[in-house]
């Protein structure tokens, strides 16, 4: 079955959206539904999971035999390759079950253990069907109802949310390591000018080096 094509980009608030003074824009966009973690701990999705944090959100279900285990394995690899120093500190990962009727906290914990995903800053959530569908519709809805109702079409798709600066990005867990890391970097808080100029110089050096080696910029 073909997975739906993913377009990447920054999330924007709907026209006319406004917030009360002192209230995050994300608080008006993200459901604050009650979920339970793999440790059976009750959490509110916005207040306890998203608020004040930079969070990668991905959908899955435990008995999935297609994209879910591959996406989980991919994120475990990224954790060990590059994300471990940040996870649980200024970067978090959360997987939300698409089949909450089957995936209670114990099932999610078993899934996480099987895939070596019980890692710092990484949570697995389950909740009521209505709340899961509301969350999925907010983050990963598709105009075609048949595609939208197929759980496999949502597995592996990721939303990177940065609450403090009010931005979110679409990403795909199956993209290259560099691409996923670039999406995470794009959602990071803005850097100071001197640091941005330094990063730009490094990027230009890499582009120049790739041109010499390959005759074009290599995409890894």
Residue ranges of model-derived segments:
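Non-globular targeting/processing and membrane-anchoring segments
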Residues: 7-11, 16-45, 174-220
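A mature extracytoplasmic/lumenal domain signature
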Residues: 47-49, 60-63, 97-100, 126-128, ...
